[in-house]
Amino acid sequence: MQIIYLYSEGDGWDMAYFPMYINLEGKKVIVVGGGKAALRKINSLLYFGAKIAVIAPKVCDEIKAIKGINVHESNVALDILQNADIVVAATRRADINDKIGNYCKAQGIMVNVADNRELSSFLFPGVIVRGDLVVGVTTGGNSQAVSKQIRNMIDRMIPEEYDVLTRKMGAYTELANVNIKSPALREEALDELVKVALSNKCVLDDKKANKVLDKYYREDAARRNSQ
């Protein structure tokens, strides 16, 4: 994966956002805000298993209807945020969002501040999900419209069958890791399995897959025996 540095004349070097994927299962997330912006963030986070608490004086009915989250209709006290792994500031007031962002940064808490990427320690990407296959798209906060268009383009390119293919490849990768000692041969074997699937509309037939793996098992064993 490549980290790209972009030069901005007069401002020195700015680093593009690194696309790091985080396991959110069971993570405590506090969303401050009860409107449409907060709703979009909540829907994104909830899919990935986060434990979400929403704090706002007024919370929209759509958020209240979401199962599995805690809703507190009150003003937020900053010290409550210390209990969170991640904080999302998505109120309608920029001054409150900025206050939350500054507090979280001072406390070392990951925070996303609506409409303020300078205060945000992470951004919400446009997401395409096919089971365990997750693709995120971001323009570094420059243009949500561009990010949305690219997300939709990629979404059309990736068929639903990739969900099953990804899970199958996970199982075959485990087999290859155990039975093919050569990293180079193992990579060749797994690449060939994907090519076989793509030639068959993303369907990986078990019989064909085992035939491919058996070929590489034998080649790997022969190489080791000759040493």
Pin down the residues of each PLM region.
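Hydrophobic, well-ordered beta-alpha structural blocks that scaffold small-molecule cofactor pockets
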Residues: 4-58, 63-64
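Alpha-helix C-terminal capping/helix-to-coil transition sites in glycosyltransferase folds
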Residues: 26, 82-83, 130
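Residue-level detector of alpha-helix initiation sites
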Residues: 35-37, 95, 141
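Glycine-rich, highly charged phosphate/nucleotide-binding loops
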Residues: 67-82
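ADP-ribose/adenylate-binding Rossmann-like module
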Residues: 86-90, 97-123
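E1/E1-like adenylate-forming module used to activate ubiquitin-like modifiers
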Residues: 113-162
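An accessory alpha-helical subdomain
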Residues: 141-227
